[in-house]
UniProtKB/Swiss-Prot annotation:
Region feature (Disordered): 672-706, 1290-1352, 1438-1529, 1561-1752, 1795-1832, 1870-1997
Protein name listed in UniProt: Nucleoprotein TPR
Gene name per UniProt: tpr
Protein family membership: Belongs to the TPR family.
GO MF term (any one): protein homodimerization activity
Keyword Protein transport: yes
Function (record text): Component of the nuclear pore complex (NPC), a complex required for the trafficking across the nuclear envelope. Functions as a scaffolding element in the nuclear phase of the NPC essential for normal nucleocytoplasmic transport of proteins and mRNAs, plays a role in the establishment of nuclear-peripheral chromatin compartmentalization in interphase, and in the mitotic spindle checkpoint signaling during mitosis. Involved in the quality control and retention of unspliced mRNAs in the nucleus. Implicated in nuclear export of mRNAs transcribed from heat shock gene promoters.
Segments passing through the bilayer: none
Biased composition (Basic and acidic residues): 672-702, 1290-1305, 1511-1529
Compartment(s) of residence: Nucleus; Nucleus membrane; Nucleus envelope; Nucleus, Nuclear pore complex
Length: 1997
């Protein structure tokens, strides 16, 4: 049957698979039909959607390529796109070229951008780091605030709850009291009432508690309720009123605040508009200056960025030509024309003066703007202050919130305490419940014991029953299994019949369907054939059409090809024409180049050439483009050809294909007809096969029916067997019932026996008899048992034997079954194979059907049918063999079944006999067990009674211990209360501290407000005071920080106390947990008791054995009882001792403090709990060993003692900790008080400082008035100058005539001397002396390391070529700005000077002077100098050794400082005398020597001070001066232009704010030793000098230099190098407009450190260095272009304006880098003579020059900015200025662009600053100007005027207070430690004073004159500030090294210190202390670094 079912399942599966395959085939057919339909619609176009569905790429192409487009059209489009692409590429090339050019420009500026980017990135990093820190801090603060808020909330809530509950408790207690009293009175007892007097009532709460809480009856209660309701309503109304009032007041406040804010906003807007108007005015001013410049010079300045790059206006070639042509004409002009020119000059001067006035007004405006800026900063600071204050308030509020939270926590604690009390009450109740439960448990245990005995009996019965049940179930299951097998056989047979019938019907249907499908397919193939024939015809037509189209296209392409050929020819022609043009152009170029060689001056040809070149380039590009196009055209033509050829080929191919298709279709038609006939034959054969299959099926059905009958017979036999098994089951059930009855009888007998036994127990006599009888019964029972065992063993052996034989049979049977199963499996496999073969056949049939439709021969089909027939035959044979085997297997199966039945019968018989034997044995065993159980029960009853007593006693003890523990817990709670109180006290203290903190904060706010108010009152405070205020402010902030830290500490302490409270609570919780544990342990003990009871039951067995011994047992039992009682007594005594010890522990614990008590008690609780556990364990073991328990108890006692000692020690530690905490709190309080006192002191100090500031303000106002007086004096000077200028005009004209007589000399000199000024962008090489445009000088100071030695070394003085410079006036307060006038010399002098041509022409200089020392000498304090008249003035000479000048320049934000040292009036009080110290740069010594020579002013009549050396030198110098005058005047003037400009120059006011060029300084001795050639020259000219006494004495500066041609070339080289470097330096400038031409105010005391200082180094004496000049641009230009006109004598009148004092430097931080050193030839230092000017005016009455806080750094002395007249009148020859050079500067955008121009002299041969080439270079030396401070009285130049340097170095000079002295004084420097050094590279003087040891003595005489000098030699100023911050300090602090002193050279000189011959730039920090008005700045590369006192960042000002 199973096989049958499996076969059927396989069959169904196969059918399913076949069905699925058929359905798949049908689907494929449908798809094929659809495709055929679509192919029919080929003529119709597909829609876009269909196309996209088919292939998206095709759809995309279809969108682009329209259906009408032909291939040629497509290709045409492609060609067009290619052309476009070419054009685009060419455009791209052009663009890339432009881009490359732009990139080059950008790369040129890349260093600037790099530097700026680096700075910006650095700043960004710092900002980012700071912001990150800030955010972190803010997050921390926020977190802390959140935590405090939460804590405050909780604490406030709990506190309120606590208060409410306390009030409730009070009220309730009062109510209860009153009610109790009423009760007592009602009962009749007398109760004394407390009289409550109304006088004692202090608060509303007391009134409420007394009157509204209590009531005696219900009526009173109702009355009270009514009162309470009334009070509630009233309170609610009042609350609402209050809320309304508060909201209204808040709203009004907010409205006011809004109005204030709006008004402030309006003010800010107005200020902004004001600033905008200012900016517009500044822009207009800049434009005006630009126009003026273009008018005067003819130079059109480019836009801001371009002007920043060019230092001087380019010399227009037109102007130079005019000048050269006009010079001969000027000879013929009459006197009238001269007069007209003079008038014109006068007019120009007047215009200049008016311009000056305007500039002055603008200056004032600038100051006001700056003042406004400062005020804005003040407002910002205020806003910051308010922000901080609000933050503080916020913090205080947060703190209050925290306090509220703490209170809430306290309430929580109280609530928790109440909870603990409740829990303790619940524990007591639970203990009572536990007691009751234990009693119940005992009862239950007794019942349990009885129940267990019964349960055991029942279990045994149950087991027996189970055994029988299992047997029966097994039998039943075997019967059921047989029945199931028979049923399955029947059902399988039926299903086989059904499935066979179903399969027959399905096969019929399938065949019918297949036939129908085949017929359909035939029809379809016919249709397809017809359709294909139609398509073939269509294709033929289409192909004909295409051929025609292709022919047309071919013709089109041929035409196109011809066109392209024509185009090509044309292009070739064009190319040939272009080549011809090119050749012609080249010829023209060649001719023009030859013409150019002939006429270099003609610039037009060059332009033509350039144009031609550009055209050439364009034409070349065109040619290239055309070539590319030609290439593309040719390639296109070739492609067209290839396309045409391809089309022809494709046509031919298509024709061939159509023919092939026709042939194939005909062949297929034939094949299909043949295939149809084959299919019909196959159909017939398949029908025959079908009939055969039916016959086979019938046979198989008959066979199956036979099998079914056989199976039914076997089923009937099985049923008979099942009935027999059921009969056996009934018999066994009856047997079971009988056995149960027997059991019941036995139980009844046992119960009776038990009762009898109990009675016998009561009677002791009957016990022994019962025992004997039991023994007898036992012996008999044991004998019976032995017999039973023997029989059982026999039966077991028989059973084993039978089981072994049965197992063998079973194994045999299993083997047979497995063989049968393997056969079945084989059959199944064969059957499966058959099915697979059938499936494969069917598949083959289907495939053959399908293939037959395509290509199938009848021969193959026949073969396949034969194969199928063979397979069917084979299958039939196999089936017959399988049936035969199956029959044999069935027979064997029956035989084995009969054997199995026989064996089972035998087995049943054996089992029955065995069971009978077992029952007998069990009965005997039960009787014995029952008897033994009865004996045991009697014994256990006695034992249980005794154990119950013991357990009850133990329970009572445990209850007592529990009560003790509860009492301890209560005590712990009481201990926690004082802790809470102490916590509250601490919180109160913290509140107090907070209040104090608030007060302090309020004080701080008040003082801040006051300081702000004072600051706003004072417009410009003293720098010192400002620093003090800042430092005090820092101190205050530190104090505030300390206070906040302390408050933080207090908070942490509060937190600690909270933590301790929490720990206490946690300990309490742990105690509760311990209680629960104890309970759990109690339960465990009870469980253990139960276990012990079981143990006792086991012990009873041993007692039974003892009973056998009889009476001996009783006596032993009694003895044991006695001993037991004793042991119990001992245990109780031990427990009593334990209790006593616990009591002593309690007493000890009561002594402990608040915190320690709780901890100690918790620990003791734990120990006691442990003890409890131990004692419980001991009690369990007491039954066994009492003695062990006693020893353990003793051990526990010792442990407890130890614990006690430990806890006492812990107590002491806790006390110490508490004491320490109290001391800490006291200390913090003391600290807070001290800080309060300190704050009060700070307040007083601030008030004092405010008063001082007010006084200083008053002084400043006085000084302003004095400056106004000076302005009036200056005006009178201008009138004098105008008259002088007229004279000079005449003299110049005369000189022109003389010059014509000496044309040779004039031509020679310009060639030698001329140093052309080039724009800063030019970077030509050395030797370009003949270039048309003159180079400019960028003079800036560079610090140099100074080492002094006795041996003087000759050093070449590098030349300073100074370019003209527009110096805007310093932004100052509206006081009179000083002016510098040019004093003309007499005609005689000029003529005499002209006689000598050898001398170099040197102008009197500001920043551009040759070698004049522009600083005042060290003035001795002991000599008050009177002011003398003009007649008393004598000429003084100044010998200047080339030195490296170290000075720190403070430039005003917009001006660089070309300084004119023109001394004409005593108003300025310039002292031309200067001290010169010679220091050779030998590494051996570093001590600066005292200068040996001082110049004496003619006004001073102190001959005893002047040494012989100086007199001799003066005489020599005078001679030299006259000689120079002659030589220079002869060599100067070429043109009328020069005359015109000379007039301007001579009348020029030389701005004191121009750049200062350091002059080489050397003593007379050194000069004598080093430059003998020069002295000889001087002696040769002495006579002429003496013959010409000066009518007016002037400050004349003459440089005697032997260097001529060499100098020229070097100048060019220098300038060109510097130009390159200047471009780089411009990057350093902070603002884009601050360029080379910008000038800073010379009054700056700026720390000149930055990039200049860093790169500067002292030059080694051996190394030859070309040091650059001062001026921060870093560009040295040979200033030879500036001539002194013919006079050669110019007086510098310099006035000191104190306006500069207040001027802060906004751009003082800026500084540009200096270019590197260039080696220089050694040359003798030039000498210069300074002629003292006439003093025209007296000094102002009270001019003070405080030199406050001078640092030990070499400080430059300042000149106040003199505003130069004639600013805008400089021509192309503005390089040849007799006085100061004018450096053309673009006007600044930041409002400080007042320009001071120097006049220009056209045609005058240019002179040159710088030493002759053959002189040795002086690397560095010191000029002891530092001693000025020590001498007390300072000259005019003692002010840090010459510390200014040009803007390009990045810095600007802040003007500080100028120093003025009553009269020029020449004094020897007394202090060797204080020194200044000049850079060796400059011929222009530059002075820095270094006050290493500055004495504070000030001359009283000088002070009386009103010209005293204040020197603050504070310990700070000298000690702390005098130290110089630099990388390499190699000298002592007293003797500042040259490294500290910035030199004027732009190129860093090589170090002159020992062992340093390298020229590495070293970073240097120079600290300057400004004058009171100024701001000190420290310059450093890339940014500002402020240190020391008063270091203020620009951003702060």
């Amino acid at each position: 049957q199973e096989q049958h079912s499996q076969l059927e399942a396989a069959k169904t599966q196969v059918e399913k698979d076949m069905g699925e395959k058929i359905s798949n085939l049908e689907r494929e057919l449908e798809n094929a039909n659809d495709l055929l339909c679509s192919t029919k619609r080929k003529g119709v176009m597909l829609s876009e959607e269909e196309l996209t569905a088919m292939s998206p790429t095709a759809a995309a192409v279809a969108k682009v390529v329209k259906p009408g487009m032909k291939l040629t059209e497509l290709y045409n489009a492609y060609v067009e796109t290619q052309d476009k692409l070419l054009m685009e590429k060419q455009e791209n090339k052009r663009i890339t070229k432009y881009l490359d050019e732009i990139v080059k420009e950008v790369e040129a500026k890349s260093p600037i951008l790099k530097r700026q980017r680096e700075e910006y990135e650095r700043m960004q990093k710092t900002v980012a780091s700071l912001s990150a820190k800030l955010e972190q801090a803010m997050r921390e603060i926020q977190r802390m605030q959140d935590e405090t808020d939460k804590a405050n909330k909780c604490s406030s809530v709990l506190e309120r709850e606590n208060q409410r509950l306390e009030l409730q408790i009070k009220d309730l207690s009062q109510q209860i009291r009153v009610l109790l009293m009423e009760l007592e009175e009602a009962r009749g007892n007398f109760v004394q009432r407390d009289d409550v007097s109304s006088a004692n009532i202090s608060s509303s709460s007391e009134v409420i508690t007394q009157h509204l809480v209590t009531y005696r009856n219900i009526e009173e209660l109702q009355q009270q309720n009514q009162r309470l309701l009334v009070a509630l309503r009233e309170l609610g109304e009042a609350k609402e009123r209050e809320e309304q009032e508060s909201t209204s007041s808040r709203v009004s406040e907010l409205e006011k605040e809004l109005e204030n804010a709006l008004s402030e906003l309006q003010q800010l807007r107005e200020a902004r508009s004001h600033q905008m108007t200012l900016v517009e005015s500044i822009v207009r001013q800049r434009d005006m200056y630009r126009i003026l410049l273009s008018q005067t010079t003819g130079v059109v300045l480019p836009a801001q960025d371009e002007t920043a790059l060019t230092s001087t206006p380019r010399k227009s070639p037109g102007v130079s030509l005019d000048g050269s042509t006009s010079t001969p004409a000027a000879v013929v002009v009459s006197d009238s024309t001269e007069a007209a020119e003079a008038r014109a000059a006068l007019k120009q001067l007047q215009e200049v003066f008016e311009n000056y006035r305007k500039e002055k007004a603008e200056n004032d405006r600038m100051l006001n703007e700056q003042h406004d800026k400062l005020q804005e900063q003040v407002t910002e600071l205020r806003s910051q202050n308010t922000k901080i204050s609000t933050q503080l308030e916020f913090a205080s509020k947060r703190y209050e919130m925290l306090q509220d939270n703490v209170e809430g926590y306290r309430r929580e604690i109280t609530a928790l305490q109440e909870k603990t009390q409740k829990l303790s009450a619940t524990t007591q109740k639970q203990e009572q419940i536990i007691n009751t439960l234990t009693h119940d448990l005992r009862a239950a245990n007794e019942k349990l014991a009885v129940a267990e005995v019964r349960a055991e009996n029942l279990k045994r019965e149950k087991e027996l029953l189970k055994m029988s049940e299992v047997r029966l179930t097994q039998e039943r299951e075997s019967l059921v299994a047989e029945q199931r097998g028979q049923n399955l056989l029947l059902t399988n047979l039926q299903t086989i019949q059904v499935t066979l019938e179903r399969s027959e019907t399905e096969i019929k249907q399938r065949y019918n369907n297949q036939i129908e499908k085949l017929e359909q397919e035939l029809a379809q193939t016919k249709k397809k054939l017809e359709h294909e024939i139609e398509q073939r015809h269509l294709l033929g037509k289409n192909q004909d059409v295409q051929v025609l189209e292709l022919k047309k296209q071919y013709e089109m392409e041929l035409n196109l090809h011809n066109n392209t050929k024509e185009l090509l020819k044309n292009s070739h022609k064009e190319i040939s024409v272009l080549k011809q043009q090119l050749n012609s152009f080249e010829l023209q170029l060649a001719s023009r180049s030859s013409q150019q060689a002939a006429n270099r001056d003609k610039d037009v040809n060059i332009e033509d050439v350039e144009e031609i070149k550009t055209k050439l380039r364009q034409s070349e590009e065109l040619v290239n483009d055309l070539k590319e196009r030609l290439k593309t055209a040719t390639s296109n033509v070739e492609q067209y050809r290839s396309v045409v050829l391809n089309l022809e080929e494709s046509l031919n191919k298509e024709k061939q294909v159509t023919e092939e298709v026709r042939k194939t279709i005909e062949v297929r038609l034939k094949e299909s007809s043949e295939y149809q006939s084959q299919l019909e034959k196959k159909m017939m054969e398949s029908e025959k096969e079908k009939q055969e299959l039916r016959d086979e099926k019938h046979k198989t059905v008959e066979q199956m029916e036979q099998q079914v009958t056989q199976l039914r017979q076997s089923l009937s036999s099985l049923q008979a067997e099942v009935q027999q098994a059921l009969q056996r089951a009934t018999t066994s059930a009856s047997n079971e019932q009988k056995a149960k009855q027997d059991c019941q009888e036995q139980a009844r007998i046992a119960a009776e026996a038990q009762n009898k036994y109990e009675r016998e127990l009561m009677l002791h006599a009957a016990d022994v008899e019962a025992l004997q009888a039991a023994k007898k019964q036992l012996t008999s029972a044991s004998a019976i048992r032995h017999k039973c065992e023997e029989t059982a063993q026999k039966a077991g052996s028989q059973l084993l034997e039978s089981r072994a034989s049965w197992e063998e049979r079973e194994r045999m049977l299993k083997e047979e079954v497995s063989q049968i199963q393997s056969r079945c499996k084989d059959l199944e496999k064969q059957n499966g194979l058959l099915h697979e073969q059938i499936e494969s056949l069917s598949k083959k049939m289907v495939t053959s059907v399908q293939e037959g439709a395509l290509n199938m021969s009848f021969g193959e089909e026949g073969k396949s049918q034969e194969q199928v027939m063979e397979i069917l035959r084979f299958v039939r044979r196999e089936k017959e063999i399988a049936e035969a085997r199956f029959e044999v297997a069935q027979v064997e199966c029956l035989r084995y079944r009969q054997r199995i039945e026989h064996m089972e019968r035998e087995l049943h018989e054996l089992q029955d006999s065995l069971n009978a034997e077992r029952e007998k044995v069990q009965v005997t065993a039960k009787t014995m067990a029952q008897h033994e159980e009865l004996m045991k029960k009697t014994e256990t009853m006695n034992v249980l009674i005794e154990s119950n007593k013991i357990l009850r006693e133990e329970n009572e003890k445990q209850e007592q211990e529990l009560q003790q523990l509860q009492a301890k817990i209560r005590k712990l709670e009481s201990n926690i209360l004082p802790l809470q109180e102490s916590n509250a006290e601490l919180s109160e203290k913290s509140g107090m501290l907070q209040a104090e903190k608030k007060l302090l904060e309020e004080d701080v706010r008040r003082w801040r407000a006051r300081t702000q108010h004072l600051l706003s009152q004072q417009k410009d405070t003293d720098a010192e005071e400002y620093k003090k205020l800042l430092s005090e402010r820092e101190v205050n902030t530190k104090r505030i920080q300390q206070l906040t830290e302390e408050t933080g500490k207090l908070k942490t302490e509060v937190a600690r106390t909270n933590a301790s409270l929490n720990t206490c609570q946690s300990q309490l919780q742990s105690v509760k947990d311990d209680l629960t544990k104890i309970k759990a342990e109690k339960e465990k003990l009870q469980k253990e008791l139960d276990a012990k009871i079981l143990d006792i039951q086991e012990k009873i067995k041993t007692i039974t054995q003892v009973k056998k011994i009889g009476r001996r047992y009783k006596t032993q039992y009694e003895e044991l009882k006695v001993t037991h009682d004793k042991m119990v007594a001992e245990a109780s005594s031990a427990k009593a001792d334990q209790l006593q010890e616990q009591a002593s522990q309690k007493e000890v614990q009561e002594l402990k403090d608040s915190l320690q008590r709780s901890e100690a008690k918790v620990t003791t609780m734990q120990t006691t709990v442990d003890n409890m556990q131990k004692t419980l364990d001991d009690k369990d073991n007491e039954i066994k060993e009492h003695q062990e328990q006693i020893s353990r108890m003793q051990a526990e006692l010792s442990h407890l003692h130890k614990d006690l000692q430990d806890k006492t020690a812990q107590e002491e530690q806790m006390r110490q900790q508490i004491n320490e905490k109290e001391e800490k709190t006291k200390k913090t309080l003391l600290v807070v008080r001290q800080k309060l006192a300190q704050n009060n002191g700070a307040k007083e100090q601030l008030t004092r400082e405010n008063e001082d500031l007010k006084q200083k303000n008053a002084n400043l106002e006085q000084q302003k008035e004095e400056l106004e007086v000076r302005m009036s004096a200056l005006r009178s000077q201008y009138d004098g100058r105008i008259s002088r200028l007229e004279r000079e005009l005449r003299e110049q004209q005369e000189r022109h005539h003389e010059q014509r007589d000496e044309p040779q000399e004039t031509t020679r000199i310009p060639q030698q001397r001329q140093i052309t000024l080039q724009p800063t962008t030019a970077a030509g090489e050395r030797g370009s002396a003949n270039t048309s445009e003159p180079p400019t000088a960028n003079i800036k100071p560079t610090p140099s390391k100074v080492t002094t030695a006795a041996v003087p070394v000759n050093k070449s003085t590098p030349r300073a070529s100074i370019r003209p410079m527009v110096t805007p006036a310093a932004v100052s307060t509206p006081t009179s700005t000083p002016t510098a006038t040019v004093m003309p010399t007499t005609q005689v002098d000029q003529q005499e000077v002209q006689s000598e041509g050898q001398m170099e022409h040197v102008p009197v200089f500001g920043s551009a002077s040759g070698s004049v020392r522009s600083t005042s000498p060290n003035v001795q304090s002991s000599l008050p100098q009177p002011i003398l008249t003009l007649q008393q003035q004598t000429q003084t000479t100044a010998f200047v050794q080339p030195t490296q000048q170290s000075h720190a320049t403070i430039e005003s934000p917009t001006q660089e400082t070309p300084v004119e040292i023109v001394q004409s009036s005593p108003v300025e009080r310039p002292t031309t005398s200067s001290t010169f110290g010679t220091y050779s740069a030998t590494p051996s010594s570093s001590i600066p020597k005292r200068p040996r020579e001082e110049e004496e002013d003619s006004t001073i009549e102190t001959p005893e001070q002047i040494a012989d050396d100086t007199d001799q030198q003066r005489t020599k110098k005078r001679k030299e001066e006259d000689i120079e005058e002659k030589t220079e005047t002869e060599a100067v003037i070429n043109t009328e232009d020069a005359l015109h400009i000379l007039t301007q120059c001579s009348n020029m006011e030389f701005p004191l704010e121009e750049e200062i060029v350091e002059s080489p300084i050397q003593t007379s001795q050194v000069i004598e030793s080093q430059a003998p050639e020069q002295l000889q020259n001087v002696q040769s000219t002495q006579d002429s000098l003496q013959d010409t006494p000066p009518k007016k004495t002037h400050n004349l500066v003459i440089v005697i230099s032997d260097e001529e041609n060499e100098d020229e070339q070097e100048g060019y080289e220098e300038e060109e190098q510097e130009d390159e470097e200047e471009d780089e330096d411009d990057a350093g400038i902070g603002e884009g407009d601050d360029s080379n031409e910008e000038t800073g105010s010379a009054d700056g005391n700026e720390d000149y450190e930055g990039d200049d200082a860093e790169e500067a180094d002292g030059t080694d004496p051996d190394t030859e260095t070309e040091d650059s000049m001062t001026a921060g641009e870093g560009n040295q230009r040979a200033a030879d272009s500036q001539n002194i006109g013919d006079s050669g004598v110019v007086t510098a009148e310099s006035t000191f304006s104190q306006e500069t004092r207040e001027q802060p430097s906004s751009a003082s931080d800026r500084q540009g880098p200096r270019p590197p050193q260039s080696p220089r030839r050694q040359a003798h230092p030039p000498r210069l003579t300074i002629l003292a000017p006439p003093q025209e005016l007296g000094p102002p009455p009270a001019q003070r020059i405080p030199v406050a806080r001078r640092q030990s750094v070499g400080r430059g002395l300042q000149l106040t900015p003199g505003v130069g007249g004639m600013q805008h009148f400089f021509d192309e020859e503005d390089r040849t200025v007799p006085s100061t050079p004018t450096l053309v500067v673009p006007h600044r955008t930041d409002g400080f662009a007042e320009a001071i121009h120097s006049p220009q002299v056209a045609g005058v041969p240019r002179f040159r600053f710088g030493p002759p080439e053959d002189m040795p270079q002086a690397s560095s030396s010191h000029s002891d100007l530092g001693q000025l401070a020590s001498q007390g009285g300072l000259g005019m130049y003692d002010t840090p005027l010459f510390l200014a340097h040009e803007e390009e170095s990045g810095g600007r000079s802040v003007p500080t207070t100028p120093l003025q002295v009553a009269a020029p004084v020449s004094v020897f420097a007394e202090n060797p430690a204080a020194d200044t050094s000049d850079h060796a590279s400059q011929s222009v003087p530059m002075v820095t004073t270094s006050t290493g040891n500055v004495p504070t003595s000030v001359d009283s005489g000088a002070a009386d004159e009103g010209d005293e000098v204040f020197v603050e030699a504070e310990s700070e100023g000298i000690g702390a500030e005098s130290t110089l911050e630099m990388d390499t300090q190699q000298e002592e602090p007293v003797q500042p090294s040259e490294a500290d002193l910035p030199s004027t050279s732009q190129d860093p000189p090589s170090s002159s210190i020992a062992d340093t011959s390298s020229s590495k730039p070293k970073p240097r920090r120079v600290w300057l202390q400004p004058q009171p008005g100024g701001r000190p700045f420290k310059r450093s590369r890339g940014g500002s670094d402020f240190r020391g006192r008063g270091g203020i960042n620009r951003s702060n000002i």
